[in-house]
């Protein structure tokens, strides 16, 4: 989507990762200061990256923050999504189906702001219903399906008796399905499962995955419009700080169709 928007406006899209910033401090900021780019969209700001924001503003480059954990940043146009509230909605859906022992497997380690936000949303939903949260219900995966598989295996090995699992994203949920199946636990008959993102493959999982649709394409389009407005010296019509809540998508993996209250 960003590529198409850039092409339509005669711009080139440059993708730069900040994963190695700890080894090469300031390299990304130096790229900005070199004036090699005309505008910048930062996706999923990490907690560790926040120290760069003031330096980026000082460079005078049009800037938009996009993704989770950006709404508390002042004086920068942001297109965010309330990942905490979205996780709360997902967990509340599982609770509405009769589940109280709901485990959570994150999509990454704690350095990502969205990891903490989704965990807080999951926890808030449980505590609002008077459910005491067991720390043993939480595991941390690391982006890919295999890590979700291993994290779910660790949960199962603890014998904490969870009847539902909220996965931090759909890819983690795919790994969880395999681990649950290998342990003889059927989804959703024995363990209900919720994902997050609604990636294209989610509808084709076995069983089809219930999830939260975050609409990154639409939000990315709005973020691009915010950036173009700055680059052209005009004002974007929408709010300079816009936040969305993901949409609940109910398929088979959560067990809603079973009408079973445990």
Language model features: what each stretch is:
Residues 1-39, 108, 119-120, 124-127:
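Amphipathic helical "hinge" segments at domain boundaries
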Residues 36-44, 103-106, 138, 159-169, ...:
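Periplasmic-binding protein-like
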Residues 88-129, 236, 240-254:
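An alpha-beta-alpha
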Residues 79-104, 120-124, 145-154, 173, ...:
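Hydrophobic alpha-helical segments within soluble ligand-binding/sensing domains
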């Amino acid at each position: 989507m960003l590529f198409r928007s850039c092409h339509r406006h005669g711009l080139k899209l440059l993708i730069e990762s900040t994963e190695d910033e700890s080894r090469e401090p300031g390299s990304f900021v130096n790229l900005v200061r070199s004036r090699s780019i005309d505008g910048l969209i930062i996706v999923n700001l990490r907690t560790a990256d926040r120290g760069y924001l003031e330096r980026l503003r000082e460079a005078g480059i049009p800037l938009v923050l996009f993704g989770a954990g950006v709404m508390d940043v002042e004086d920068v146009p942001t297109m965010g999504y309330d990942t905490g509230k979205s996780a709360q909605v997902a967990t509340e859906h599982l609770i509405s189906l009769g589940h109280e022992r709901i485990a959570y497997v994150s999509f990454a380690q704690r350095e990502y702001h969205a990891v903490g936000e989704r965990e807080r949303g999951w926890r808030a939903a449980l505590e609002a219903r008077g459910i005491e949260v067991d720390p043993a219900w939480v595991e941390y995966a690391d982006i890919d399906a295999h890590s979700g598989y291993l994290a779910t295996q660790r949960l199962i090995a603890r014998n904490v008796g969870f009847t539902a699992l909220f996965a931090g994203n759909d890819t983690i949920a795919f790994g969880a399905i395999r681990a649950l199946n290998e342990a003889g636990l059927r989804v959703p008959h024995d363990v209900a499962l919720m994902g997050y993102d609604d990636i294209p493959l989610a509808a084709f999982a076995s069983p089809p995955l219930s999830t939260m649709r975050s609409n990154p394409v639409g939000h990315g389009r709005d973020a691009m419009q915010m950036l173009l407005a700055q680059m052209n010296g005009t004002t974007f019509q929408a709010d300079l700080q816009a936040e969305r809540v993901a949409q609940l998508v109910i398929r088979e993996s959560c067990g809603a169709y079973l009408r079973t209250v445990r």
